[in-house]
Amino acid sequence: MYSRKQGSAGDSMFRATIDRLIANRHLPFALMHRASTGNRLELLTGELSTIEALDQLPDPDHDGDGDGGARHDLLLLMPFRQIRERGFECVDDRAPMWLMRVTEQHEADRDTAVAWLPDHPVVLSDAAFDKDDAAYATIVRTILSEEIGRGEGSNFVLKRCFLARLDHHDTAAALSIFRRLLERENHAYWTFAISTGEGIFIGATPESHAMLADGELCMNPISGTYRYPADGPCANGLVRFLGDRKEADELYMVVDEELKMMASLCEDGGHIVGPVLKEMACLAHTGYVLRGACDQPVRDILRETMFSPALTGSPLESACRVIRRHEPDGRRHYGGVVALIGRDADARPALDSAILIRTADIDPQGQLRIAVGATLVRHSDPQSEAAETTAKLSCLLQAIRGDAVTDQPDTPVHATVLGALPGVQAALRQRNQSLADFWLRAADSRRRQYGGQLSGRVLILDAGDNFTHMLRCQLAAMGADVAIAPCDGAFAMDRFDLVLVGPGPGDPQDADHPRLRALRRITRQLLAERRPFLSVCLGHQVLSDILGLPLRRLAVPQQGVQREIDLFGQTCRVGFYNTFVAIADTDRIEPQGMELSVEISRDALTGEVHGLRSERFCSLQFHPESVLSRDGLDVLRYVTSQLMYSPHQVPRTATARS
């Protein structure tokens, strides 16, 4: 039976339940403050179990119990190892996926309820990082040289763990930590204490994972960290941070990754709102909000959004391999998700979820573990990344220890006015000036602006990077009928007017990798059958190699780099994600035995090839679909229309295209 109490009766039940939980440490519960609930605390109790996969997630309860209003049915704690459900690699540390069927839900005013919580001192012993700064910096250097430097991806998140032992670790101690977090960290997305009856999770996470409300899916990519100086944040320091290209690049790459997720779940993909400044007690982050209409089941949303690129890297599948190689002890729940699943007042599915970061994981023996990480990009400084992990730990650690709050009552961090400091809003707006307008427009605006510019059927071959879903959104918005198929799967190319050989991670010269073998076979077939095709990034590199152009590893990878280039006589600002590049010393080649004349767009100084084109194909080293490609949609429209509608194209009959 489901029970929910509000008002004075709810306050009494809330307080009585707190007392009951303190008296019995083995009762499972969830005590939360969520940004979407205003000044309310929520207290949930229920039946706790574990499940192995999201397919075992029960459907929301619609049995009519309760008051008929909005309600929570399920609380889910997803460990990082669930990424296996997407077929990605991970260390299987056997961390459980906890599921609570909510039977009681109580609410109380936050300011009132805080006074009902204990405020006991907590003593830590044997406190230290599992990897000191020097050891962490060494691994950072290894990832920069051996992973990013070899083309495995554009950015990766490396964690380390702060370990300690709590001398007292009962429910009263846990609620004391929660109380101090509430008092110190006013701007978290979720602040929570969740007991499994065995261990407990206590955290203040700044980052939403995914929210479904009124048929709209929202995600909140956050990246880039401004660490407050000892004397507090200031306008000049914050504006310098907002103008730092390294910090902006981190965020843009995360936005691209989450746009991929939105594009796989929403028919029209997501659109970008922001940027926004996420203020926390000890630091601030930059982020965006992504929105899109979505009719997918909650379990599918949770599966397809495993897990935030801000906590893994890009491309996601490649990032998981890198994490497995460099974090042999596993991640447990770090980077996983805590989710509330239920229904709204109109009985529609509802989801609110947060990323499990800035979270203490305390086991039944009182062993505390706090995982923190930093995003590594091509120009990361190892010592600075180590310092960033320490900064991310500081507020939670202060709340655990009960350290005195620094007396800075007039600083912006306490007044919550960082966004109002001189120059900050202009610096935030400036971040959008070089981004692709397509992703800044909502779906209806895109249809009005771009609809009807293309027709015909396009087959996108997925080579292991979900940028393909963003390409689908752009082509579909312009009017094309688009299908996606794995490059190593079965498909009928003769049913389509154009084949797009998609991007993917890896070394284009790796003759043994199954995906690369498939790309070579397909590209040779397209050339032999003289079918119109467009190749992007890895597909472009494979084509270049087949045509006889040498490939070279870049000394400095172009991962998440925006450049202004000359593309066949047109100036374009576009985004690159590549470690390898084709090289040419001429503007045209005629490959031996192919009866082709191929025009080359290249950097006049370095010989790096930006694109190739011939009568029936075109290729692009950059990603026209990336949020970094300000002119990407114009390029995509031009090359696809040229390939589909040029005189060589034989019209398809209605039967052949069905």
Residues covered by each model-derived region:
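Contiguous alpha-helical scaffold segments within structured protein domains
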Residues: 103-127, 165, 226, 234-324, ...
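An anion-binding catalytic pocket shared by soluble metabolic enzymes
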Residues: 26, 34, 160-249, 342-369
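Pocket-forming structural segment of enzyme catalytic cores
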Residues: 520-536, 540-634, 638
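Acyltransferase
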Residues: 416-453, 625-658
